Amino acid sequence: MKLIRTVAAVAAGCYLVAATVLALVGLHDHAAPADVIVVPGNTVRPDGTPSERLGARLDAAVSLFNERLAPTIFVSGGVGEEGHDEAAAMARYLVAHGVPASAIVQDPLGFDTAATAANVATYLRTNKLHSALVATQYFHVARTTLALERHGVSVTGSRHARYVEGRDMYSLAREVIGYTLYLATL
């Protein structure tokens, strides 16, 4: 019984350390010029507008774009439960916030982080480009960066979305598992 408690305590400690590292990585904004800014999709409301969480990701991308750190914003997402194309909703939001439509690339096939990374890599290779900035929630930065790098994309930095909600603790815990799986499989 003592061995089980010891193993459980060590496992819990490792999990907490991993969650802390992922959070700190995501909260450390740094950005250098890149070819594109990547914004992974998230919930779109039933009325077709981005959720507050997704809007915060897009606001981070607009900030990077306005700082002229990349000439293009790559928005990626699938069709969510609400029946809306996340990439199209994100593009509309960006245009409404001053980003020219010509500076937006829509990827409607970004059903998850791995698919988004693969699609970004294909876009960059096709256009003889190679680098990206990441704009997403702090807990998602490390896994998004890992996925992009595993697909050959040079990630020059990130900016986390300035939006916090109660489910972030669940999301951070989930990211520990997701990051570990990506390390093992991508």
Regions found by a protein language model. Give the residues of each.
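N-terminal membrane-anchoring alpha-helices
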Residues: M1-D35
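Hydrophobic alpha-helical segments, especially transmembrane helices
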Residues: L3-T6, L58, E175
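Enrichment for repetitive, rod-forming helical segments
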Residues: A12, L64, R150, L181-Y182
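Intrinsically disordered, low-complexity N-terminal regions enriched in serine/proline/glycine
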Residues: C14, R92, G178-L181
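A structural signal for short, hydrophobic/glycine-enriched beta-strand patches
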Residues: A23-A173
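A transmembrane-helix-recognition feature enriched in membrane-embedded lipid enzymes
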Residues: D168-L186
